[in-house]
């Protein structure tokens, strides 16, 4: 335990919180260009082919972003928007692709949770 005199001479330092999404640089989203679109397999005990892409961001970072939803139209050189949010069973994937923004289309025939997948309200 520090004495009062020690604390007067050198106050306690506040630990700076480390960001989970450093490539966003405190922005809500960032734009980038797909450099590679591929599938990868999740950690045990899950099994699937998860759709992901490598993205070169406008600030120079190169990150891996998850493409949510069923089916996508992304390929190399597609311009996309990414947001934060990791994928628990894919190590190293800390960003999500925003569906329905820039070159990334919304999910076809989506009826529920449409706002998360960039789908307009269907005509009644």
UniProtKB/Swiss-Prot annotation:
Gene name, per UniProt, is: rpsL
Q: Name one GO biological process term.
A: translation
The molecule here is called Small ribosomal subunit protein uS12
Q: Does the keyword DNA repair apply?
A: no
Q: Which cysteines are joined by disulfide bonds?
A: none
SUPFAM superfamilies (alphabetical):
Nucleic acid-binding proteins
Q: What does this protein do?
A: With S4 and S5 plays an important role in translational accuracy. Interacts with and stabilizes bases of the 16S rRNA that are involved in tRNA selection in the A site and with the mRNA backbone. Located at the interface of the 30S and 50S subunits, it traverses the body of the 30S subunit contacting proteins on the other side and probably holding the rRNA structure together. The combined cluster of proteins S8, S12 and S17 appears to hold together the shoulder and platform of the 30S subunit.
Leader peptide range in chain numbering: none
Q: Which CDD domains match?
A: Ribosomal_S12
User: What protein family is recorded?
Assistant: Belongs to the universal ribosomal protein uS12 family.
What Gene Ontology cellular-component terms does the record carry?
A: small ribosomal subunit
GO terms (molecular function) for this protein are: rRNA binding; structural constituent of ribosome; tRNA binding
Q: Which Pfam families match?
A: Ribosom_S12_S23
Q: Which UniProt keywords apply?
A: Methylation, Ribonucleoprotein, Ribosomal protein, RNA-binding, rRNA-binding, tRNA-binding
Oligomeric state and interaction partners are given as: Part of the 30S ribosomal subunit. Contacts proteins S8 and S17. May interact with IF1 in the 30S initiation complex.
Task: Give residues where 3-methylthioaspartic acid occurs.
Answer: 89
